[in-house]
Amino acid sequence: MALSRLSSSSSSSNGSNLFNPFSAAFTLNRPISSDTTATLTIETSLPFTAHNCDPPSRSVTTSPSELLSFFRTMALMRRMEIAADSLYKANLIRGFCHLYDGQEAVAVGMEAGTTKKDCIITAYRDHCTFLGRGGTLLRVYAELMGRRDGCSKGKGGSMHFYKKDSGFYGGHGIVGAQVPLGCGLAFGQKYLKDESVTFALYGDGAANQGQLFEALNISALWDLPAILVCENNHYGMGTATWRSAKSPAYFKRGDYVPGLKVDGMDALAVKQACKFAKEHALKNGPIILEMDTYRYHGHSMSDPGSTYRTRDEISGVRQERDPIERVRKLLLSHDIATEKELKDTEKEVRKEVDEAIAKAKDSPMPDPSDLFSNVYVKGYGVEAFGVDRKEVRVTLP
């Protein structure tokens, strides 16, 4: 499969320091990497398919530092999820656990096309989205193991990661329920006029939920800056899209709402689509992005992932479309990094993950009294009365 067509230029780089915890780890020795103004123009591996709108350009502007950040961050995400699998099998992680390996390009590309003013809300496959928003490995593993240093203080677990200070409004365990909440965030953004948008992520398994269409309708009616992102990994639990949807072209599901189908295994295509969608949403209201992606693990830890699909199918996607390998090829073909440097990066990532796991194991368990905290939000002192204002009087939470 042809990866892309490449060209170099020397103009001001539009790549910002998107992944602060990771980008500092790279030192570049070749001529292209020593030029801070160097840019690359890369054509996406596949064209965008549009519904009720003109598609964005396939030519994406990037930089050596951004590509290196993509590689390292996706490698970190991949290793983080594989290690979580081992921890689950060792009974150090309990309950539900949904892994994201294979889909890393969506989380990384979305970060590259947004700012921390923008909001992201997603379903239960949320570990990598949290990490992309600036979360740390310690917070991830401590939460997965139910420890006090977790991002939700050990009380949320795998499905309920959260980082409000970076605009990440969490993973949510109820299928599709996060989409109306995301549209509510977009309502707040429009009310405050802060020129930001909300990305509400859901899977193909949630695409048939009624509340999704209700939220989309009100968002379109009020021109809210809401971007609905369907992460189509082709299987809702063990059900293939063709078995659950009469029309699996999810980017067209909005009818009167524009949509765009994106190669969700290409981080640069995701970046381009998210920038395009943000510009559209701020001017014209909601838009749907369908990310064509793939998960390597089963739906959850109880799913071997091979009863409803063949191992040949999984290995075929790995060979042809793996998001990390795509970026690796770009880095090597442009002489931005050597194979040894990339392998060294992967070794560093493995070490970081191991160190974070060790620290998370040392984190204390929540105090039993914490069971009763965060049950209700702090009251605003609002009072409710009965019909005659004497019958019933209560202070609302």
Swiss-Prot record:
Binding-site residues for Mg(2+), renumbered to this chain: 204, 233, 235
PANTHER family assigned: PYRUVATE DEHYDROGENASE E1 COMPONENT SUBUNIT ALPHA (PTHR11516:SF60), PYRUVATE DEHYDROGENASE E1 COMPONENT, ALPHA SUBUNIT BACTERIAL AND ORGANELLAR (PTHR11516)
Species, as recorded: Pisum sativum (Garden pea)
Residues where pyruvate binds: 98, 124-125, 173, 175, 204-206, 233, 235
Activation/inhibition comment: E1 activity is regulated by phosphorylation (inactivation) and dephosphorylation (activation) of the alpha subunit.
Protein name: Pyruvate dehydrogenase E1 component subunit alpha, mitochondrial
Subunit structure and binding partners: Tetramer of 2 alpha and 2 beta subunits.
Function: The pyruvate dehydrogenase complex catalyzes the overall conversion of pyruvate to acetyl-CoA and CO(2). It contains multiple copies of three enzymatic components: pyruvate dehydrogenase (E1), dihydrolipoamide acetyltransferase (E2) and lipoamide dehydrogenase (E3).
